Design a protein with these regions (language model features):
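N-terminal presequence-like segments and the immediate start of the first folded domain
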Residues: 1-71, 77-125
């Protein structure tokens, strides 16, 4: 069984200090998608969440799957007072027939203005 890596972030002048990661890794029939943050960092939690979820869709598509195949999601937000606004966008985006197991936590982001980051695991049929 091979491991397929997509969207490998390498060190360059504009992202110096960031980790070298693969945003999407597929092993067997499971895809792991991480480091999904707003880029550029603009707007409120709703704007950033919508931007991040569009990127999730892009990465899932790249791996040959979609949000109906999500198994789990981990969400980090900058402040729990943003939880309801984040969820309003999440609930519009998620496949209501196939919601993943999900956790939402708060964190201090290292990038100024960043309000949300998402990591998901999905089946890859």
């Amino acid at each position: 069984m091979s491991i397929i890596r997509h969207e490998i972030r390498k060190i360059s002048d504009e992202n110096r200090g960031q980790p070298i990661i693969s945003q999407a890794v597929v092993h067997g029939n499971v895809g792991y998608f991480a480091g999904i943050t707003p880029n550029p960092i603009v707007g409120d939690i709703k704007t950033q969440t919508a931007q991040v979820l569009r990127r999730v869709d892009e990465l899932l598509n790249l791996a040959g799957t979609d949000k109906s195949q999500l198994l789990s999601a981990q969400v980090w937000i900058a402040d729990m007072r943003l939880f309801e606004d984040h969820n309003s966008v999440w609930n519009e985006w998620i496949d209501p027939a196939n919601p993943p197991a999900r956790a939402c936590l708060t964190t201090d982001f290292w990038r100024p203005g960043m309000l949300v980051e998402v990591m998901v695991v999905a089946a890859v049929p």
